[in-house]
Each structure stands twice: as structure tokens, then as C-alpha cells.
Amino acid sequence: MSRPFASAPARGHRQGQEERERRSEEGGSVPGPRTFQVVSPVVTPGQEATLFRVEAVEEGEARHEGDVAGIGREFQLLAEDIVEEVEVVADEEQEQRPSQELEEKTVEEQGQERPGGPCERQELDALQALAALQVELSSEREQNRRAYVQFMRKNHQRRKRHLARRSTIIQGIPGFWAKAIMSHPQVSVLISDQDQDFLGYMMDLKVQVRSHPPSRCKLIFSFRDNPYFLNSVIIKEYYLDITGYRARRSTPVHWFWDFERGAPSRRRDTRSLNFLNWLSGHNGPESNRIAEIISEDVWDDPLKYYLREEGSSVRDN
């Protein structure tokens, strides 16, 4: 690369020497040497020519010719350093330009893939299809729920009619419920002589199950006048959950005085679990199990246990 300032110091040196000689002969003062100050480069990228704006600053003291020559050489070195620095800057700019273009291209490609790329369009289509299918499933589930509720309502009404008719028929069979209860194999082992006597006063049994949470079961026993207690109705209520039956409450039994505090032969035997003790409280270890047997076995099919001792001739016919 050509260096435009290579010859400048030589010409400046000769012209400065002639000027000093001429002024010395004329008797005038010789101005001091000038220091050249580079103010700013004018760089044109990709071209070798480099222009500088140079200002001359006049010094107050005269220098020798050797000093002037030194200044010229310093200026030459300074110009060479500036040219080399400009070349390095230009090279760095050329190196940075391809990397910047590559980076811009990468960002551009990523921007094109994100908003409207094939993968995103596929995912959007799949989500739309899934949403449409979910609407259909929700609608079908709601229809099934309504159909189930309607079926259960109809089934409950039909069962209620059947139970009412069954109760009417059982009223014509004296001691039906007492015999059905005492004939169950798991209850029969608890029945005492006293139980057999007081169950003879039992008129009716009803079981009410509430399925809405919390699920509950009510056992309603109806009695005619008897020598044991004043109650005509005794209700035992239980909670129903995954663990089985759990006692909730029971109607307090109003015993006759002679049965509770009278002669020992008439007193209620509270030392063991029997049906009368179960009916009057929830303290027995098998209290919940007895409630489950009556509610799910005896109530669902009382005729099965009523005929247990007499055989199955009625069913066979």
C-alpha cells in the first residue's frame, strides 16, 4: 500500500531550511518550526487512499535543523501508524460483517419457523381436533348422567310401589317380620327367650336408605302395646361409607319400671348381646353388623328367611 506522507518530511525540511536562510540574510526573524497535529482521519472502507486534515501549530522557540528533521520523521511515523490502524479497523469491520449477516439470517429463519412453521400448524390442528372431540365427550357424558338420574328415579318409584304392596301383604301374616329376623343364621345365635317374647309384639319393619352423601340408613321398628316399653316406634339410624355401617343415633327406649327395676326375673338382661339390648342402644360389639344384616339381607328378601325352617316348598310351587 502506498504511503502518501512518505516524501512530506523531506520537502518540508528543504523548504524550511531555505526560508530560514533567506530570512536570516534579510535580517528578519526566523519563525520556529511547526508541529503538525492530525485532527481526524477520513476513511473510505475498501480503498487504500487515506486523507488527513492536518493543522500546523507554530512554536514560540526556534529549533535547529536536526530538530526539524526529527519532527518530520516523527510525523512520518505517526502517519504510518494511523494508516496501519485504519487498515486494521477496516479488516475488523469486514470480518464482523459476515458474522452479523449470518446472525441476522439465523434470527430471520427462527422467526419464520416460530409463528407459522409446520410443527406449530400441526400442533394447532391437533389441539382444535382434540377440543372438538372433548365437546362431544362432555355432551355424551351429560346425556348419560341425565339418563341415569331418570332411570334411578323411575326405578325408585317402581320399587316404592312394590314395597308398599309387599307391606300390605305382610300385614296379613302375623309375626312375619319377627320370624324372618330370628331365622337369619347370624341373628338366630343372639336371640334369647326374652327376645322371642318381645319380638312377638313387633308389627312392621321399614328400611329407608338415603343415597345422597352422607349416605344414611334408617331401620324403623313398629310395635303394638307390650309389657316391655312404652314406645310404639323405635328408629335406629346409621351412616354408610366404605367401612360399612356406623351408628348415628337411636330412639331412647322408655322401659316399664318392673322390667327395668322390678323383680330379677322380669329385669332386662344387660350382661350379654341380645336383640333387645341391640334395639335399645349402640354399645354392643356387633351392633353395626346386625344393622347391616337386617338392612341388606332380611329387608331385601324376607321371604327367604321366613321360610328357612319350613323348607322351600312355597318357592318351588
UniProtKB/Swiss-Prot annotation:
One of its GO terms (molecular function) is histone binding. Phosphorylated. InterPro entries: NAP-like_sf, NAP_family. It comes from the Eukaryota. SUPFAM superfamilies: NAP-like. May be involved in sperm differentiation and proliferation. One of its GO terms (cellular component) is chromatin. It is found in: Cytoplasm; Nucleus. Gene3D superfamilies: 1.20.5.1500, Nucleosome assembly protein. It comes from Bos taurus (Bovine). Residues 15-26, 95-112 have a biased composition (Basic and acidic residues). It holds the Pfam family NAP. The lineage of its organism: Eukaryota, Metazoa, Chordata, Craniata, Vertebrata. This is Testis-specific Y-encoded protein 1. Keywords: Cytoplasm, Developmental protein, Differentiation, Gonadal differentiation, Nucleus, Phosphoprotein, Spermatogenesis. GO terms for biological process: cell differentiation; gonadal mesoderm development; nucleosome assembly; spermatogenesis. Transmembrane segments: none annotated. The keyword Cytoplasm applies. Testis. Probably in spermatogonia. Residues 1-39, 91-118 are annotated as: Disordered. The keyword RNA-binding does not apply.
